[in-house]
Amino acid sequence: MSAVVESHDHHHGPAKGISRWLFTTNHKDIGTLYLWFSFAMFLIGGAMAMVIRAELFQPGMQIVEPEFYNQMLTLHGLIMVFGAVMPAFVGLANWLVPMMVGAPDMALPRMNNLSFWILPFAFGVMLSSLFMEGGAPNFGWTFYAPLSTTYAPPSVT
């Protein structure tokens, strides 16, 4: 006589709620996380752009100190390039590339998830530099040093 044992693997179903987004290995979910992060950074960078434009509305200081203005200008450029544009491309790539090549998922899906979760932490550290002693970098969004600070090493004759 044989006994039939039922499987009780109810806890192995698809994740729901917040754990779906925290621990996902699905390329579409990770792509969606990148796209939402990109949108949030676009809003933060856009708010900085509005402060920058309001400061430039008239000559003189209206809203922020000159040093804070330069810091905000630098972080605005960093956020828009490395926080909005590049994560949007990565999010679209996470969504589309596996479907285009016929793969079920990205290679190394857990590392794909980890690479996303490093991003909010890094941008949190970068944004917190605005409010730390010493402040954020303040050399403009192009990262060019002013021409008045150029240094020419002594020439060898």
What does each model-identified segment do?
Residues 1-157:
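...captures the hydrophobic TM-helix bundle architecture rather than a specific catalytic motif
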